Design a protein with these regions (language model features):
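Metallocofactor- and cofactor-centric catalytic cores in central/energy metabolism, strongly enriched
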Residues: 1-205
């Protein structure tokens, strides 16, 4: 039986005599420039959450002059972290949800061009190919209902949205997204099946 690995000892002198730069932590930064498009009517009639949301939108860098635009929500099952050049920074669970962030970006840019204020939220999906022969298979069918519930809650949690676009793939994420959009019958919705759906150039399947 191997002995536990001991961590390097750190003395008090190591701490007090360390490079002072490690203690120079940035705790403040300039806020976004501009003014929120507030009106007397908004302050009197709108929910307080709408006003708070404006501060969050500006804090993320959106031009305050455009925050009065109609909001449109984009949902997806994106997984992994893909660098702009396509290099994997962190892998997803399967190739189906690996690149749908590109579709989300294209949709968001088009919505912004058309005068909307795009929002995006995500709930990724598992791969039962990976869980074959393990107890992870027990989660595949249950995931559909769980994710549909999460997507529905994400829709309701953005009260200012005027419509929803869902991008999803495969036999778990796509049904989950379909159920979520179908349950939001009061909103205009678009479902986009995305991901790796082209046949390989060299192979049977």
């Amino acid at each position: 039986m191997s002995s536990p690995v001991k961590s390097a000892e750190l003395s008090f002198a190591d701490i007090v005599e360390s490079d002072r730069a490690v203690w120079e932590v940035q705790t403040a930064a300039p806020g976004p420039e501009g003014r929120l498009p507030l009106t007397a009517e908004m302050l009197l009639e709108r929910p307080s959450g709408d006003i708070f949301g404006l501060t969050q939108n500006a804090g993320m860098g959106w031009d305050p002059r455009e925050l009065g635009r109609p909001g449109f929500l984009l949902l997806s099952t994106q997984g992994g972290i893909r660098a702009p050049d396509g290099r994997p920074v962190a892998l997803g669970y399967h190739t189906g949800h690996w690149e749908i962030g590109l579709l989300m970006q294209a949709a968001a840019e088009e919505l912004a061009r058309l005068g909307c204020l795009p929002f995006a939220a995500f709930c990724s999906d598992p791969c039962d190919g990976r869980t074959q022969g393990t107890t992870g298979m027990l989660d595949s069918l249950a995931y559909r209902n769980d994710a549909a519930q999460v997507f529905r809650r994400l829709i309701r949690s953005l009260p200012t949205r005027k419509g929803v676009l869902g991008v999803a793939t495969c036999d778990k994420g796509l049904p989950a997204m379909m159920m979520a959009l179908a349950s939001s019958a009061d909103l205009p919705s678009v479902l986009v099946p995305g991901g790796v759906m082209l046949a390989t150039s060299d192979g049977e399947d």
